[in-house]
Amino acid sequence: MKTFYIVRHCQADGQSKDAALTPQGITQSHELAQFFSSIHLNQIISSPYKRAIQTTEPLAHAKQLEIKIDQGLSERVLSSKPIDDWYEKLKLSFTDLHMTCEGGESSQEAMNRIVEALHEQIKLETDHTLFVTHGNIMSLLLKHADPTLGFEEWKKLSNPDVYILKYFSPDHIEAKRIWQ
């Protein structure tokens, strides 16, 4: 069995790749470090987005771990252009995994990307890996573990949020929310 901790970034000021944590988000990042203080971690892997990296900096410092960057943990791009009904499109994308919007990534494509990042770590000897990522891509990884999960679970994610994912085999993955 391999253990993964999947973390959604703390509160941020916007959705761009360069969006930083808010003052509240910075406080949350320190609370997150405290939350993990008694949990053994071997490595931290983050999305390249600024808010994800800032989320894990206090934890990486406390654990004396390097923050590795993996593009596979980047947030899913629903569309490259603004869309008025993005909420409805996002909802539909949880049932129609192959639906795409202009310049965007389907749920299936995004799921494949984050599952590939997970499988790359499964191949290694390292256990107790922490991924820092984003809400939509995180919910797609959880949907991979449990196909009954979807849009409603995405709506319930908090900033930050933490799930433990236990990988026993390709057909046996358990995911559980552990953030209070």
PLM region spans:
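Domain-level recognition of soluble alpha/beta enzyme cores
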Residues: 148-174
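Short active-site segment of divalent metal-dependent hydrolases/proteases
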Residues: 12, 137-138
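Short beta-strand scaffold positions
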Residues: 46-47, 112, 132-133
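Generic beta-sheet signal
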Residues: 4, 125-136
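Glycine-rich phosphate-binding loop signature in dinucleotide/nucleotide-binding domains
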Residues: 38-40, 121-127
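Short, solvent-exposed aromatic-acidic interface loops
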Residues: 175-180
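Active-site-proximal alpha-helix that buttresses catalytic centers in soluble enzyme cores
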Residues: 2-67, 103-108, 160
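Phosphate-handling substructures
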Residues: 61-116
